[in-house]
Design a protein with these regions (language model features):
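Short, solvent-exposed positions on alpha-helices
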Residues: 132-137
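Conserved metal-binding segment of the jelly-roll/cupin
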Residues: 54-67
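Generic protein-terminus/edge-of-domain signal
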Residues: 1-56, 96-101
């Protein structure tokens, strides 16, 4: 069940975002970079054969074409995802589409400056979209 679904395309940037209830095992991959921020509950996530658990406020950044899956470990688990098209990154690095990476927070990094800033900007983008304003300035 999606609570929020938004897409945006303008010149050099294309992205979509969704807030949804995480349920049963869901395996996928896509051509965009995915940022997942866990808002509520706990999930088990697998990325390129690495299995880990996410807690509320944890974030994961997954490069294009990296297979990944999520599984709710309890009821009423809510996640916020942002998918960013490759064109945005390829204007800075033409080889970006060939990279594979997974960057994730855990208990020791959840509140560091990088992940705190990532969550802050994601929340600000969400607020602008909800108000009908452009999230890109």
């Amino acid at each position: 069940m999606d609570y929020f679904d938004y897409s945006y395309k303008h010149n050099y940037i294309e992205f979509s975002s969704t807030i949804y209830r995480v349920g049963t095992y869901h395996y996928n991959w896509h051509g965009e970079t995915e940022i997942l921020i866990l808002l509520k509950g706990r999930i088990e996530m697998s990325c390129n054969d690495e299995l880990f658990t996410l807690e509320p406020l944890d974030a994961v950044i997954i490069s294009p074409q990296v297979g990944h899956s999520t599984l709710a470990l309890e009821e009423d688990v809510i996640a916020f995802t942002i998918h960013v098209g490759n064109e945005f990154y390829q204007q800075y690095d033409p080889d970006f589409g060939s990279y594979q990476f997974v960057v994730r927070s855990d208990e020791s990094t959840r509140h560091n400056q990088f992940f705190t800033t990532l969550r802050h900007h994601a929340a600000m983008m969400l607020l602008l979209m909800a108000k009908g304003e452009s999230p890109v300035h």
